[in-house]
Amino acid sequence: EFCLGLGPTLFGITKGETKYSIHLLPFGGACMMEGEDGDSSDDRAFTNKPVWARIAVVAAGPLFNFIMAFVFSVILIACIGYDKPVISGVMDGYPAQEAGMQEGDTIVKMNHKNIHFCREINLYLYFHAGETVDVTYERDGKETQVTLTPVYDEESGGYYVGFYENNARTRANVGDSLKYGVYYTKYWVDLTFESVRMLFTGKVGVQDMSGPVGIVKTIGDTYEESKIDGMFYVFINMLNISILLS
């Protein structure tokens, strides 16, 4: 059986020796082969194939998830551009302003980790909340490094270094689309591994992880947040979720 989606089957047809079906939840999918769930006398069955062939089949799934993520990321960047890590402003009295950072500065590194677009800034600060960070920024072709210690805000319950990112999109040519497609794919991989690391180190608990209900809620929240920018952005953000779930 070859199916698209998860959950109850909405529609299915059998053609030749294969059943094709569409399921309720619009993400994920499966390819279930003869002999995968039990013994089969068919020479073509999965369990009757050599070990190297079975390893290749099992490895092909994760490999093509990465390839799919890269292809979708390139399409995403080509269609809507990328967000340069440029500061749009600083907050009065916060570490960024006190360190001399200004509107228009471009963030290059955070604790020696290269930064390519705004989401990487948010990702780093989220997973290192409250930690002192060495920020390298570029202004007029010159790089400067400053050390920022986040300030805790009781009202919001979060830590802030005190600068805003400029989320304006920059048009991408073919080369930029391919290059930032790699960066974007790496971003999602980093996000996934950091989330797992926080789970194992106790920074988040199992109760913070989403099951099917949480995933559906996330999709709903993403739709509400994105629809103001148009249905194309809704589609793109849903695509991002699909990449992560893969």
Predicted segment positions?
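Conserved PDZ fold ligand-binding element
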Residues: A96-C118, T185
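Functional transmembrane alpha-helices
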Residues: A45, K49, Y152-L245
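Interdomain regulatory linker/hinge segments that flank or connect interaction modules
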Residues: M33-E34, S40-A69, Y126, Y137-K142, ...
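Short domain-boundary/entry signatures in modular proteins, especially
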Residues: I77-S88, E165-G175
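Small-residue-rich helix-interface/hinge motifs
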Residues: E1-S41, L245-S246
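Alpha-helical transmembrane signal-anchor/signal-peptide segments
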Residues: I80-Q97, Q102
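PDZ-domain C-terminal substructure recognizer with occasional recognition of PDZ-binding tails
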Residues: Q102, V108-K109, N122-N166
